Amino acid sequence: MKLTCMMIVAVLFLTAWTFATADDSSNGLENLFPKAHHEMKNPEASKLNERCLDAGEICDFFFPTCCGYCILLFCA
């Protein structure tokens, strides 16, 4: 009986928490994916457009863009 009451209270609490912290639904689907929407406006901002460097090419130690690892300024 106690377990049932605790489960009911937990479900009611989680339901109330969901409604209390939910965003305003008046926007509908407008702001559902704000980052993806921003990237569609600026396709150069997408990380999918970046090309990784092949093995043997020179890489930057602090910002490596290798497909594998950057070892001694060369992609491995």
UniProtKB/Swiss-Prot annotation:
In the UniProt record, does the keyword Disulfide bond occur?
Answer: yes
Q: Know the name of this protein?
A: Omega-conotoxin-like TxMKLT1-0141
Task: Give the GO molecular function terms.
Answer: calcium channel regulator activity; ion channel inhibitor activity; toxin activity
ATP-binding found in the keyword field: no
Q: In which tissues is it expressed?
A: Expressed by the venom duct.
Keywords, sorted A to Z = Calcium channel impairing toxin, Disulfide bond, Ion channel impairing toxin, Knottin, Neurotoxin, Presynaptic neurotoxin, Secreted, Signal, Toxin, Voltage-gated calcium channel impairing toxin
Q: Which GO terms describe its cellular component?
A: extracellular region; host cell presynaptic membrane
Write down the superkingdom of origin.
Eukaryota
